[in-house]
């Protein structure tokens, strides 16, 4: 009987999902993206060769895998063509192995222009978006005015819809944000130049998945960003514009929730965050700088430096409850090599003096929150590239065990380096 496994970020994104998805895809027939857009980069290193995927599922590097982009993904034709070109130049057959839902909202130049105009207007109160038009595209979807992949089949109607929506956007860009208008003909020409390529890959993703499940095929759902950036369950308003939690699989790919067998939450051995928003365990000292240096903590898409801090078990508990996480994969364990002490946040001291074991929902409720730490001895040995858990230093194993105890979730996979071989699978999600 086949298994359906969700791989998602349990923190604020950048946990190393791409490597783990790639690692597990030798077991699956389908890899599915179900939310987000090209705003999150999934970095894979295979035999020393680096690949950054932003939109196409990470399974594309496995020849036997079919990749699906579900309706919950906002799709930029420009980004898709660029990524396809990069992969095809390396001999990877994308067009015959990538299928796209006709219900995917399109990201077009006016979305990008609006995204950048808004962030500029907010100044130092900016949310910290990637400026790739993700939020405005989701707005159009909810407002039921957006153009979708399926609209590309009728070019005359597409052109008419585009004119109406561009009038709406340009009025705001010019008169409210004092920005340049987006050119209608240029936008239309750019989309039509690639429309036939995209429509040739259109398929009924939900039905494909249902048939695959009934046949007993293994399916992997690849999440983007992280749980604490979920539009509903994250630190609002410092969140992304999609549902990054496991529930997004049902709404973003048309896959029934009862058919999900395992949810693998990806966690770093510490915490990072890009952009604004609450971060209780953030470090502003030399320790934080050293974690950032050793972990090479810069965004795969934006290049922005990531904020770094100790592991936050309180925030993780919210991820566990909202995702029904079955097991964790801990990445970047080797980054903590050499520290004399390592801390785990096990509680929050609220401004009123109360102790909280679960993270607040809204960003405003995090103000004045202080972390309550448990300190563990570190280790001086090198763990980089270790693939046998018994070869890990005793203090490393104690740290892992303590995180399991505090969170109540077992660690199924350990990653000690960026390459797919630098991994320990303690409990295979597809074998459970």
Swiss-Prot record:
EC number of this enzyme: 6.3.4.4
Statement: the UniProt record of this protein carries the keyword Ligase: yes
Disulfide-bond pairs as recorded: none
Binding-site list for IMP: 14-17, 39-42, 130, 144, 225, 240, 304
Pathway the protein acts in: Purine metabolism; AMP biosynthesis via de novo pathway; AMP from IMP: step 1/2
Residues annotated to bind GTP: 13-19, 41-43, 306, 332-334, 415-417
InterPro entries in the record: Adenylosuccin_syn_GTP-bd, Adenylosuccin_syn_Lys_AS, Adenylosuccinate_synth_dom1, Adenylosuccinate_synth_dom2, Adenylosuccinate_synth_dom3, Adenylosuccinate_synthetase, P-loop_NTPase
Catalytic residues (UniProt): 14, 42
Subunit structure: Homodimer.
Protein name: Adenylosuccinate synthetase
Species of provenance: Histophilus somni (strain 129Pt) (Haemophilus somnus)
């Amino acid at each position: 009987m086949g298994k359906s496994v969700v791989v998602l970020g349990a923190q604020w994104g950048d946990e190393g999902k791409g490597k783990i998805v790639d690692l597990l895809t030798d077991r699956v027939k389908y890899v599915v993206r179900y939310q987000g857009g090209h705003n999150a980069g999934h970095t894979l290193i295979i035999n020393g060769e680096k690949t950054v995927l932003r939109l196409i599922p990470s399974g594309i590097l496995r020849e036997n895998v079919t990749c699906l982009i579900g309706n919950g993904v906002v799709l930029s034709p420009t980004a898709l063509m660029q990524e396809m070109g990069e992969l095809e130049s390396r001999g990877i057959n994308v067009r015959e192995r990538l299928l796209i839902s006709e219900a995917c909202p399109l990201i077009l130049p006016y979305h990008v222009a609006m995204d950048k105009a808004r962030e500029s207007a907010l100044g130092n109160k900016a949310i910290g978006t990637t400026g790739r038009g993700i939020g405005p595209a989701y707005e159009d979807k909810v407002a039921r005015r957006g153009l979708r992949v399926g609209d590309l089949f009728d070019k005359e109607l597409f052109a008419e819809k585009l004119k109406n929506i561009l009038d709406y956007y340009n009025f705001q860009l010019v008169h409210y944000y004092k920005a340049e208008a987006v050119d209608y003909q240029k936008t239309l020409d750019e989309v039509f130049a690639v429309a036939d390529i995209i429509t040739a890959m259109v398929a009924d993703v939900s039905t494909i998945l249902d048939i695959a499940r009934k046949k007993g095929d293994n399916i992997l759902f690849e999440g983007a960003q992280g749980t604490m950036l979920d539009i509903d369950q994250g630190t609002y308003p410092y969140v992304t514009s999609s549902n990054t939690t496991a529930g997004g699989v049902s709404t973003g790919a048309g896959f029934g929730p009862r058919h999900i067998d395992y949810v693998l939450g990806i966690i770093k051995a510490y915490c990072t965050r890009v952009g604004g928003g609450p971060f209780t365990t953030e470090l502003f000292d030399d320790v934080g700088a050293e974690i950032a240096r050793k972990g090479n903590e810069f965004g795969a898409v934006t290049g922005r430096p990531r904020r770094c801090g100790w592991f936050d078990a309180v925030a993780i508990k919210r991820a566990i409850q909202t995702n029904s996480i079955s097991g964790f994969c801990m990445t970047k364990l080797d980054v903590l090599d050499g520290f004399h002490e390592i801390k785990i946040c096990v509680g929050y001291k609220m401004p009123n003096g109360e102790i909280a074991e679960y993270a607040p929902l809204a960003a405003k409720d995090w103000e004045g929150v202080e972390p309550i730490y448990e300190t563990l001895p570190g280790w001086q040995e090198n763990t980089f590239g270790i693939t046998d858990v018994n070869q890990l230093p005793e203090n490393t194993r104690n740290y892992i065990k303590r995180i399991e105890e505090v969170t109540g979730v077992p660690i199924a996979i350990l990653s000690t380096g960026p390459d797919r071989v630098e991994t320990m699978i303690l409990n295979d999600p597809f074998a459970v």
